[in-house]
Regions:
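Beta-strand-enriched cores of mature, soluble protein domains
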Residues: 21-132
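Bacterial N-terminal signal peptides that target proteins for export
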Residues: 1-8
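Bacterial N-terminal signal peptides
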Residues: 8-18
Length: 132
């Protein structure tokens, strides 16, 4: 029993340090997506967006399905789907999932996405007034 207590104590100390050491590395790009349509549902809102030059993915089409987690509708979770076609004709397909918050007309999103070429971390904002 004493060894189990020691093991738990070590895990409590080491685990938070491991989380703090997380770093995102690898290829990255910045881009602006234009919201092309918005659909309101009883349990959430769907956004379709596109970009002509999303890094190695080229022309990209996205769908975000946002669901609120509280009555004030200022945060929640979302799932989505993406399709990209590079200038060389390479097709990329993505399953997207993350969290969102809203401050006025700005929605901030973060996600971990499973894409044809691996796992991607994404963060960005959507301005509901400008559509970008």
């Amino acid at each position: 029993m004493m060894n189990l207590n020691k093991l738990l104590a070590v895990m409590v100390i080491v685990f938070p340090m491991t989380i703090a050491a997380f770093e995102v590395t690898g290829d990255h790009f910045k881009d602006t997506f234009k919201i092309t349509s918005v659909t309101a549902h009883e349990d959430g809102t769907s956004f379709n967006a596109e970009s002509d030059s999303a890094g190695q993915y080229g022309k990209v089409y996205l769908t975000y399905n946002l669901k609120s987690s509280n009555s004030s509708r200022n945060s929640g979770t979302w799932i989505g789907y993406g399709r990209g076609i590079s200038p060389e004709g390479n097709l990329a397909i993505g399953n997207l999932m993350g969290v969102w918050t809203r401050d006025g007309s700005i929605i901030s999103i973060k996600s971990l996405d499973e894409v044809t070429d691996g796992i991607n971390f994404m963060q960005g904002t959507m301005d509901l007034i400008s559509g970008e």
